[in-house]
A protein has these predicted regions:
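Short, basic/aromatic beta-hairpin or loop at an interaction surface
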Residues: 156-168, 294-305
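C-terminal amphipathic alpha-helical segment
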Residues: 213-289, 293-296
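Short beta-strand segments in beta-sandwich/barrel cores
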Residues: 283, 304-309, 323
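Transition-metal
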Residues: 1-157, 217-248, 273
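Short acidic-glycine-tyrosine-enriched beta hairpin
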Residues: 175-187, 310-330
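Ligand-binding loop in jelly-roll beta-barrel domains
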Residues: 99, 107-112, 143-146, 192-212, ...
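His/acidic/aromatic-lined binding-pocket segments of jelly-roll/cupin-type domains
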Residues: 104, 113, 130, 136-139, ...
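Loop-centered beta-sheet repeat module
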Residues: 165-214
Length: 346
């Protein structure tokens, strides 16, 4: 994370400083379908070409975020949470795991992603060495005019029918394609066959899992000239082969308070996601925000910029693309600026 994101005064330090929010530096992934937008538009400054994903909030073994401000700067988020498990929260399902149960990403799809499916927790626990499955939620940050997603199947089908269609290159006739636009949201339950299409810029909130079973990858080759591995047997074992209803975008229902509006985007057993819009340019009162003891929270800034004023007067500046982690039972901050966030809770 570059220094532009951090402006912490050092008036004094005390025990309460350990409960202040901190910035996270992401891990980058250079999958072949990625582009340049995360560096160009979100100032990620990651030396990868292409840059397909940034894991903004992650403690996964395949890539942990790095703390980029405050007392723990330079440590991995995984290290910090192992030192301070109380930062995760008091809810029983969080304490039972003792680790971060979710991951938050930005995804830049310059090309189509593979047609894929993720296992649920039970299957992953039994067949993938106790790992989590993967249910996820997508929020569309931007989309090309013709951008689309694959969202399940058009009709009920059978394993062998899909297997044959993969072998003869006709899988796409079974797939439900959905046009997308900026601001759309989609809930992708484990077992749903899906794919992000070219031209989509996505924020993804998901279980902390990197398990993906590919059904079809357009016969592409990687930088070494090799086709990427398919996982057809496992994919067909976990896939929901019933037709999926075409998703309908919900009516927007905002809750307002001075300088702030918020709406619930997604509620499931794994996470809650709100969209929060802050604009204090025309009001004297800053927007208060903090986590409670039950769970950590994460604010992902998807547009705009501003600052967070701590109780001791220290200031944390944030910009578009920044990810801020709030330990459970955090100090209260006052937010000033004009910005949009995804507000993630467990």
């Amino acid at each position: 994370m570059t220094s532009r994101n951090i402006n912490l005064n050092t008036k004094d330090t005390d025990v309460s400083a350990k409960k202040v929010p901190f910035l996270l530096k992401p891990v980058g992934k250079d999958y072949l379908w990625g582009g340049r937008r995360l560096n160009d538009e979100f100032a990620k400054d990651i030396d990868m070409e292409p840059l397909a994903e940034t894991w903004e909030c992650s403690t996964h073994p395949d890539g942990s975020s790095i703390v980029a401000s405050g007392e723990y700067e330079g440590k991995t988020l995984d290290e910090v949470l192992k030192e301070h498990p109380e930062y995760i929260g008091t809810q029983p399902h969080l304490q039972a795991k003792g680790e971060l149960p979710i991951m938050i990403k930005f995804i830049d799809a310059k090309s189509d992603l593979s047609v894929q499916v993720h296992p649920d927790d039970d299957y992953a626990r039994e067949h993938e060495n106790g790992q989590l499955g993967k249910t996820e939620m997508w929020y569309v940050l931007d989309a090309a005019k013709d951008a689309h997603l694959i969202y399940g199947l058009y009709h009920n089908t059978k394993k062998e029918t899909l297997r044959k269609s993969i072998e003869n290159g006709t899988l796409e006739k079974h797939l439900q394609k959905v046009k997308i636009k900026k601001g759309d949201q989609f809930y992708i339950q484990a077992g749903m066959i899906h794919a992000i299409g070219a031209g989509a810029l996505i924020a993804e909130i998901q279980e902390s899992s990197n398990l993906t079973y590919r059904l079809y990858d357009y016969d592409r080759v990687d930088k070494n000239g090799n086709k990427r591995e398919l996982h057809v047997d496992k994919a067909l074992e976990v896939a929901n082969l019933k037709s999926s209803k075409e998703p309908v975008q919900p009516m927007r229902v905002f809750k307002y308070r001075q300088g702030c509006a918020s709406e619930l985007l997604c509620h499931c057993k794994y996470f809650e996601v709100f969209r929060m819009i802050v604009n204090t340019e025309r009001c004297r009162k800053l927007v208060g925000y903090q986590s409670d003891a039950a769970s950590f929270r994460v604010l992902l800034c998807i547009n705009g910029c501003g600052s967070m004023v701590m109780q001791d007067g220290n200031v944390l500046n944030f910009f578009k693309g920044d990810c801020i982690f709030f330990p459970a039972d955090s100090v209260k901050v006052r937010i000033h600026g004009k910005a949009k966030f995804l507000d993630v809770r467990c």
